[in-house]
């Protein structure tokens, strides 16, 4: 019984030491990352004489589109998808 209690105590100390090491590593990684702006929308304007993939999606010339991080605004429709820093987001165009 004493052996079991001793092994349990050693296991708890080892787990606590490992947890402290992981939290320090996470703090170091967070400190190394550059600050990012939360709302970075990318606006796209399609010129009249420019043939592009947007026109193939049904987006007409002269339409302003934006790559949104969340949902499209009420006066916009989703015309496809785009990427911001490697993540896929909706491509929203004004109606």
From Swiss-Prot:
Residues 20-62 form a propeptide. Disulfide bonds join 65-93, 67-82, 72-92. GO terms for cellular component: extracellular matrix; extracellular space. This is Corticostatin-3. It comes from the Eukaryota. One of its GO terms (biological process) is antimicrobial humoral immune response mediated by antimicrobial peptide. Keywords: Antibiotic, Antimicrobial, Antiviral defense, Defensin, Disulfide bond, Fungicide, Secreted, Signal. PANTHER family: ALPHA-DEFENSIN 1 (PTHR11876:SF28). It is found in: Secreted. It comes from Oryctolagus cuniculus (Rabbit).
């Amino acid at each position: 019984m004493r052996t079991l209690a001793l092994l349990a105590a050693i296991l708890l100390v080892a787990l606590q030491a490992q947890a402290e090491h992981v939290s320090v590593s996470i703090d170091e990684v967070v400190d190394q990352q550059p600050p990012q702006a939360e709302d970075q929308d990318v606006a796209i304007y399609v010129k009249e004489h420019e043939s592009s993939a947007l026109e193939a999606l049904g987006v007409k010339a002269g339409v302003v589109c934006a790559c949104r991080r969340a949902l499209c605004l009420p006066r916009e429709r989703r015309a496809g998808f785009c990427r911001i820093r490697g993540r896929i987001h909706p491509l929203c165009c004004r109606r």
